[in-house]
Every structure is written in C-alpha cells, then in structure tokens.
Regions:
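Short gly/pro/ser/thr-enriched loop/turn and capping motifs at secondary-structure boundaries
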Residues: 106-110
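Secreted/periplasmic carbohydrate-active enzymes, especially glycoside hydrolases
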Residues: 1-101, 114-160
C-alpha cells in the first residue's frame, strides 16, 4: 500500500503523490495501481469504488507516431476499437495492449448535437483512467467536437 488517507467528504479533491512510480509500459510492463475510495459514515463504509489505473507519458511526433514513455508504438500494435464496455479496456490495461478508440457509433446514435456532446462527455470521463487508450478518434463530420474531447482529456490526441 502506497498511501492510506482519509479526507472529509467536503474536500473537492485529494492529491496523493507517488515517489518514483513504475510506469505502465504496454506489453513490456503493464503496471497498474489501484485507488480505493469510500464513503464512510459513522465508521461504516456506505459506498466504495475500486479503480485500477496506470501512469505513462504519452506524446505524438509531428509525423503522427505515438510515443509511450518515449518509445514509438508500432502502427501494427495499435488496436482500433469502436467504443467498448470498460471491462474490455480493463483487460487491455492488464495485458498491455494499445487502443485508439473510434467514437463513430457513439456519434451516430446521438439524437442531436447536444445528445452527442453528452454521450461523448460521459464516455470520455468514464474511460479516461485507462492507460491502454492512447487516442480518441472522431468521424470527420463530427470534428467540431474535438475541442470538447481535448477539454475533457488533454492527455490524449484526438484524431479524425
């Protein structure tokens, strides 16, 4: 256990610092950490969430190459997937796979622009902790939502 801290429910956020964390590095080292957050009332746990996550540095070269912790991810290793159940990404996180999530179907089922915005927001926030997701991909006819995705998740590139 790296840390065990209690903070009041009124605290808007809590920051925990890790010293020399092991980076999630794809198949080489798919190291995951776990955050357990609970709501304790009068000493009894009323609600709890267990959230595995990985730490990694992600960047993109001017030629379009994706780098994880400074190493190029070969195009053949990047799995293009339509939006999936979070359990799919859990498995990818654990086995060190790399994903580019195509959001086309999510955009297609939206009733209107506001619905699309809401669906994209929910999906990105729900899956932003997965280190296996390296990028989001929007259909070209929904490129105007790129700014929203970048605002929600500034750590990943948005592709078209």
């Amino acid at each position: 256990m790296l840390a065990n801290k209690s903070v009041p429910a009124s605290a808007p956020e809590h920051i925990c610092h890790l010293t020399n964390p092991c980076l999630w590095n794809g198949k080489t080292s798919p190291k995951l950490y776990v955050v357990v957050a609970g709501l304790i009332v009068n000493g009894a746990t009323e609600d709890q969430i267990v959230l595995p996550f990985g730490l990694r540095n992600l960047s993109m070269e001017s030629n379009g190459s994706v780098l994880v912790n400074g190493l190029c991810v070969p195009e053949k290793d990047l799995i293009r997937t339509l939006e999936s159940d979070p359990f799919v990404y859990d498995d990818m996180d654990e086995d060190g796979s790399f994903a580019c999530v195509e959001l086309k179907e999510l955009c297609d089922i939206a009733a209107d622009e506001e619905d699309c915005r809401n669906l994209l927001t929910e999906y990105v926030l729900q899956n932003a902790y997965h280190p296996s997701i390296l990028c989001w991909k929007l259909p070209e006819d929904h490129a105007d939502f790129a700014a929203l995705l970048r605002e929600l998740d500034s750590t990943r590139p948005v592709l078209f």
